[in-house]
């Protein structure tokens, strides 16, 4: 697996679990909301969820995303 493939997998899974979170919770999380909750800027989440993701994400930010979405971090891989 290449680095680019891994970035796409992680990004797609962040989007999938954010949308699942929205399906099961009254509080809906936009990309902006998620970014705010992890202390990042909105473009990070947008780029991460994009199939043209060339930014990647730090382990710390992925950990924070996993906590906000209540998803074990390994589910993103």
Residue ranges, per PLM feature:
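A short, Lys/Arg-rich alpha-helix, primarily the initiator
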Residues: 1-27
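DNA-binding alpha-helical recognition surfaces that contact promoter or target DNA
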Residues: 12, 47, 67
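The alpha-helix within a helix-turn-helix
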Residues: 18, 35, 66
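Short alpha-helical DNA-recognition segment
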Residues: 24-48
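DNA major-groove recognition helix of helix-turn-helix
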Residues: 49, 61, 77
């Amino acid at each position: 697996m290449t680095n680019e493939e891994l970035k796409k997998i992680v990004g797609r899974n962040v989007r999938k679990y954010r949308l699942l979170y929205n399906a099961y919770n009254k509080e809906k999380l936009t990309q902006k909301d998620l970014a705010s909750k992890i202390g990042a800027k909105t473009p990070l989440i947008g780029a991460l969820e994009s199939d043209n993701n060339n930014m990647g994400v730090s382990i710390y930010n992925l950990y924070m995303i996993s906590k906000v979405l209540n998803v074990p971090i390994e589910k993103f891989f």
